[in-house]
């Protein structure tokens, strides 16, 4: 029996963090020929993750250009992937989540009648402009995908409501938790953490396209109020490379000695910063999944989330982008021990560290290399 030719395609830092455990898992199985392709939609931040997990791509399309539009990213990725798929002819292409690379990769595969497996399938907000462009990217990828690897039961239900075939959906847990299990380390230290010392550290991430402009201004004003009121609080903000984000961050925090504006952290550093934080303010999707495993409350700086399981479990709260609301919720976590304890002890509904194994074993079952289907993630 010939080997199963599997190609993983990704292009951004968040994708790379979640695909890295799967890439490493695929290499363990003699039945599989694994190819790694990166579009490098985010060049520098992607390379940090590849280096951290010791992954060398087989194909690097290197499409990154400064301030390129969504249309340019899509068209560049589509043309380059079209050429690659024509040459390599994989049996299945695995894409992740909701980036422009995800959509372009699935569309290019469809044009060649190559099967598509969608990792982290079924997340939905129901608003095609929130998050933008991610919500529609994942819906369109879902329309193309042949196999849907849903992280949770809720994600599976979303797909069933869209009339996806039940036997094409597999609940695996989220590969983000697989990654976390290998990166958080006892005795971790960093010069920035030394500067924070014994103060309470709030870890901030803010970069989403739909939050640029007034929403981000409101977030930053709320954070200024928090550090102005609480002398034992410091904020660490690894600032995204987007020039618009960097300009706003330096405008609001450039003169603050208790808001540390630092370069984007490598994945191992970021996970360990999160583990040592008091709580997290974020508009990132991945952080919403990772923090529950670390016992850290999360205030989500968005009006919607495609990860309602965390809200239901109690570890996430939607803070939105209103200055007063963000301020009040952050203040509550700093002054109400019971509320902090309640949020920090919530269970993680997103994974158990076995998602990558389940995905690979499901592929082998689907293509006839294994007789038994793997277990599903139950979230318990």
From Swiss-Prot:
Coiled coil: none
Gene Ontology BP term (one): cell wall organization
Phenotypic consequence of residue 374 to L: In TS-21; temperature-sensitive, develops, at the nonpermissive temperature (47 degrees Celsius), a coccoid-like morphology, i.e. a phenotype associated with a deficient synthesis of poly(glycerol phosphate) teichoic acid
Catalytic activity: UDP-N-acetyl-alpha-D-glucosamine = UDP-N-acetyl-alpha-D-mannosamine
Pathway the protein contributes to: Cell wall biogenesis; poly(glycerol phosphate) teichoic acid biosynthesis
Keywords, alphabetical: Cell wall biogenesis/degradation, Cytoplasm, Isomerase, Teichoic acid biosynthesis
Family: Belongs to the UDP-N-acetylglucosamine 2-epimerase family.
Chain's role: Catalyzes the conversion of UDP-N-acetylglucosamine into UDP-N-acetylmannosamine, a precursor of the teichoic acid linkage unit.
Protein name: UDP-N-acetylglucosamine 2-epimerase
Provenance organism: Bacillus subtilis (strain 168)
Lineage: Bacteria, Bacillati, Bacillota, Bacilli, Bacillales
């Amino acid at each position: 029996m010939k080997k199963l030719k599997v190609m993983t395609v990704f292009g951004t830092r968040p994708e790379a963090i979640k695909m890295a455990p799967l890439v490493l898992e695929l290499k363990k199985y003699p039945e599989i020929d694994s190819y790694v392709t990166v579009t490098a939609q985010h060049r520098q931040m992607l390379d940090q993750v590849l280096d951290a997990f010791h992954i060398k791509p087989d194909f690097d399309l290197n499409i990154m250009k400064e301030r390129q539009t969504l249309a340019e990213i899509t068209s560049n990725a589509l043309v380059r992937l079209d050429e690659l798929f024509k040459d390599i002819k994989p049996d299945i292409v695995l894409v992740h989540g909701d980036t422009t690379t995800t959509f372009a990769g699935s569309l290019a595969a469809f044009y060649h009648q190559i099967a598509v497996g969608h990792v982290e399938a079924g997340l939905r907000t129901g608003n095609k402009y929130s998050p933008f462009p991610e919500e529609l990217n994942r819906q369109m990828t879902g329309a193309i995908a042949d196999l849907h690897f849903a992280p949770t039961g809720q994600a599976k239900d979303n797909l069933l409501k869209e009339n996806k075939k039940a036997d094409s959906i597999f609940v695996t847990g989220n590969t983000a938790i697989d990654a976390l299990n290998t990166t958080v380390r006892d005795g971790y230290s960093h010069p920035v953490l030394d500067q924070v010392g014994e103060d309470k550290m709030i870890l901030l991430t803010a970069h989403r396209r739909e939050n640029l402009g007034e929403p981000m201004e409101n977030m930053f004003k709320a954070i200024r109020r928090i550090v102005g009121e609480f002398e034992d609080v410091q904020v660490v903000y690894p600032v995204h490379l987007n020039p618009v984000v960097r300009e706003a961050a330096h405008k609001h925090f450039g003169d603050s000695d208790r808001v540390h504006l630092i370069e984007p952290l490598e994945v191992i550093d970021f996970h360990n910063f999160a583990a040592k934080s008091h709580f997290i303010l974020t508009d990132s999707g991945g952080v919403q999944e990772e923090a529950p495993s670390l016992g850290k409350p999360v205030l989500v700086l968005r009006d919607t989330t495609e990860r309602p399981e965390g809200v239901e479990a109690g570890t996430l709260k939607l803070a939105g982008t209103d200055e007063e609301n963000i301020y009040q919720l952050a203040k509550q976590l700093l002054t109400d021990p019971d509320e902090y304890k309640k949020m920090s002890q919530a269970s993680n509904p997103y994974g158990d560290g076995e998602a990558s194994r389940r995905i690979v074993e499901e592929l082998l079952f689907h293509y006839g290399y294994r007789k038994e289907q793997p277990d599903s993630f139950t979230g318990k």
